């Protein structure tokens, strides 16, 4: 699985990265592992998966985490994840 993550502010990409996880875990575990790696790389706290976020990710393999998804204040508009490749 490859996931592309990017931080967006004022319609511009501030940071982006692609993280891969081709382990034997379930899809859900891989996604959570990748989210942890991305947050570590971007020096962010882990976002909260709201019901709407989960539904968007299930439907489109893509989701956005805005200020409502983070406990800490953020200096960007949103963080977006998109699955580029599945196992």
Regions found by a protein language model. Name each.
Residues 3-6:
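Amphipathic beta-strand/beta-sheet edge segments enriched in Tyr/Trp
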Residues 9-11:
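Solvent-exposed strand-loop boundary residues in beta-sheet-rich modules
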Residues 13-41:
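Short, flexible N-terminal segments of the mature chain
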Residues 34-87:
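Acidic, low-complexity intrinsically disordered segments
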């Amino acid at each position: 699985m490859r996931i592309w993550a990017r931080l967006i502010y004022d319609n511009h990409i501030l940071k982006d990265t692609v993280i891969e996880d081709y382990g034997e875990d379930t899809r859900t575990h891989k996604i959570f592992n990748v989210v942890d790696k991305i947050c570590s790389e971007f020096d962010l706290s882990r976002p909260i998966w709201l019901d709407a976020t989960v539904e968007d990710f299930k439907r489109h393999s893509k989701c956005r985490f805005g200020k409502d998804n983070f406990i800490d204040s953020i200096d960007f508009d949103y963080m977006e994840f998109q699955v580029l490749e599945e196992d």
